[in-house]
């Protein structure tokens, strides 16, 4: 199948949205599916997102997206994000009367409210409007589906996440004092958080905990420098990638996930796959993954997360690994494929034949008018 992906989130951004789509695309490309990925780095005029300059917003994108659409002739269009590119892709599909699917990867209203004086109800009105005409809205967890249904969203389907169990593996654990120990010189146990260092991630709830050993944060983001100054006893290691990141996960004793705004939290599975138990609040994502797993603890929001974190020290690391092995990227990719909204074959054939005829007419007219001008 030929699939057009429209996304405001792509490299060099490092987040769960980008990692999810990269892995799904890689799995499906290996099976022969073709992709055209439309993202801000593809020659669009961009402007930095206020308060978060690392994120670029593509401007005046509709014409260029339509040109890509006509050149690629996709069988399905999937819109990943609700940003400026996502808006342009949605508008194009509606104008062209072409079906499309969307995804609800992030709590957009909460993210916006954390940065600007915009109430969450206004954000949900926008997001509900954005997804209204999507043939299928892919949502990370069943609890997120229930929450959005209660807000009158339609066409929702649960679409879980996977984890690379080869990249994230207990064998990469380095014990205290070993050569290459990423936490060299730090008192044990190691309580770790990995992710974007931003206000919406609720990282302060983690670094303020009274925990034994060492509190470590791996990641970069707009809140990093401020947190470094405010919490000098916390160890901020910056962004890590590849084997360096995998070694951090596996060498930690407990992974602490304080976020209340994630819709899933890929890092939770990455930690478990590395053999590291997870302590989290009872928020969307963790409450769908952790209960019954024996691979972590769930704390009611506002409860004692420090106790949940220290309780994780008694959990069996092998059990964490076994549980994470049940999340396959191949299954996630196939579910994505099944949720796309392609036109039926006869209708698709007529759609593109009609569009080609119109395009040829426009070209012929342009050539004719240019001759009249000379």
Model regions and ranges:
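Short alpha-helical donor nucleotide-sugar binding micro-motif in glycosyltransferases
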Residues: 69, 240, 247-252, 336
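Aromatic "clamp/platform" in nucleotide-sugar-dependent glycosyltransferases that forms part
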Residues: 260
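A charged, aromatic-enriched C-terminal amphipathic alpha-helix characteristic of glycosyltransferases
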Residues: 314-364
């Amino acid at each position: 199948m030929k699939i057009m992906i429209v996304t405001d989130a792509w490299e060099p951004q490092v987040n769960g949205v980008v990692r999810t789509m990269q892995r799904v695309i890689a799995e499906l490309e290996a099976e022969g599916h073709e992709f055209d990925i439309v993202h801000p780095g593809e020659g669009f005029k961009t402007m930095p997102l206020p308060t978060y300059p690392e994120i670029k917003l593509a401007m005046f994108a509709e014409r260029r997206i339509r040109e890509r659409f006509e050149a690629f002739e996709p069988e399905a269009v999937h819109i990943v994000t609700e940003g400026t590119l996502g808006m342009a892709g949605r508008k194009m599909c509606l104008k062209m009367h072409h079906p499309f699917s969307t995804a609800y990867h992030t709590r957009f209203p909460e993210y916006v409210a954390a940065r600007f004086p915009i109430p969450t109800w206004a954000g949900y009105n926008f997001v509900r409007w954005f997804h209204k005409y999507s043939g299928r809205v892919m949502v990370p967890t069943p609890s997120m589906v229930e929450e959005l249904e209660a807000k009158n969203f339609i066409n929702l389907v649960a679409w879980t996440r996977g984890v690379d169990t080869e990249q994230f593996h207990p064998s990469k654990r380095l014990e205290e004092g070993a050569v290459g120990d990423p936490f060299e010189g730090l008192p044990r146990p190691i309580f770790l958080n990995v992710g974007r260092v931003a206000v919406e991630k609720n990282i302060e709830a983690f670094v303020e905990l009274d925990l034994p050993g060492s509190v470590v944060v791996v990641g970069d983001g707009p809140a990093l420098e401020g947190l470094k100054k405010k919490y000098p006893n916390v160890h901020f290691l910056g962004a890590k990638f590849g084997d360096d990141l995998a070694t951090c996960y596996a060498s930690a004793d407990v992974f602490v996930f304080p976020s209340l705004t994630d819709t899933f939290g890929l890092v939770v599975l990455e930690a478990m796959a590395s053999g590291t138990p997870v302590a989290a609040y009872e928020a969307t994502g963790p409450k769908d993954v952790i209960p019954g797993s024996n691979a972590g603890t769930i704390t009611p929001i506002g409860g004692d997360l420090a106790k949940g974190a220290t309780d994780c020290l008694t959990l069996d690391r092998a059990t964490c690994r076994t549980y994470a092995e049940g999340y396959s990227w191949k299954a996630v990719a196939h579910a994505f494929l099944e949720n796309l909204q392609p036109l039926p074959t006869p209708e698709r054939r007529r759609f593109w034949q009609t569009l080609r005829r119109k395009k040829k007419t426009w070209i012929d007219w342009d050539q004719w008018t240019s001759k009249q001008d000379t």
